[in-house]
């Protein structure tokens, strides 16, 4: 790890043209460096949370670089927990680079990836779960990812984990007391009940792992079915506008078509595929094979069948993640099947029920409001394994498994985490955050 106290600086806004650009400066001596490159009210005399208008200058020549606002945040009431200064200049890359040059010349060094947030973590302003939430919030592309990240940044996940960890540590202390002073121990039933309650909470968190992954990375939704089954019409109905060409002639879609779609705050790519059927046409056969590959790779599949026509034999699909949809429900039915959701793309009948089914398939019953990174999921899986192990042991032998379960939970917030794991978390950040 780099030195934690030396002054660091970085451009904190995206590179390119813009109305405003921000350069951050943090660490020991940050206010003194800022004073040397500033023409205006002395930053060292400003109270924390105040700003002033002036000019950034080259102290060696006195040349003005840009008019700017200077903001001062004093330790420990700053993002990093250190004295921190922000220069808000015009958003020219030439200006921002020149400001960086004079700051480095005056003793600051360019910050590494995520170094401002790393300092916040090391100075106790954030735990590791909150630091990961900062990155997730920066990278959020959908509304659900934004909500998940903000809740985690506000400490919702950390508080939940800390409560579970404390319950295990309390139970561990009682079991130790039982071994040392048998007459004052806890009843076996109480220990089992506590373990089962903690395990249920861990399971509830893990149940949201899929929704968290989809919220952060997006999902692919494939529409599969026979020619003229109504796939393109259903896609248009879900989108709310006409994206796919619709025709009564079977086989209109011979290749796949993609369209971005956000449902329940999750960024989706909906894929309308070629009709799946037996065919001698080599071009159409290629489209069918591609459609089945797309279904295999999709996060969720809609198997679309025309309810007004005889039901075709089903193609090979990943049924565990497939919803069955009976289209053209406004026409007289040729068959009935309770496994299929009846939908009319023409009238909109059944679209609400289909969206609810999509919601549950994507988010699960828990609702998907918890941000979980891959690292955190691994820690929860380890905790679950140790809790299950503890439940299978007599009370006087479950101490080690309990201790390891508590340690696994502590990994989520960074209490029990190796330095290389911390480094791996922060190297995913951009410079300036």
Swiss-Prot record:
Cofactor(s) needed for function: K(+)
InterPro entries: G_TrmE (IPR031168), GTP-bd (IPR006073), GTP-bd_TrmE_N (IPR018948), GTPase_MnmE (IPR004520), MnmE_dom2 (IPR027368), MnmE_helical (IPR025867), P-loop_NTPase (IPR027417), Small_GTP-bd (IPR005225)
Cofactor note as given: Binds 1 potassium ion per subunit.
GO biological process, one term: tRNA wobble uridine modification
CDD domains documented for this protein: trmE, TrmE_N
GO cellular component: cytosol
Broad class of where this protein is predominantly found: cytoplasm
PANTHER family assigned: TRNA MODIFICATION GTPASE GTPBP3, TRNA MODIFICATION GTPASE GTPBP3, MITOCHONDRIAL
Name of the featured protein: tRNA modification GTPase MnmE
The organism of origin for this protein: Thermus thermophilus (strain ATCC BAA-163 / DSM 7039 / HB27)
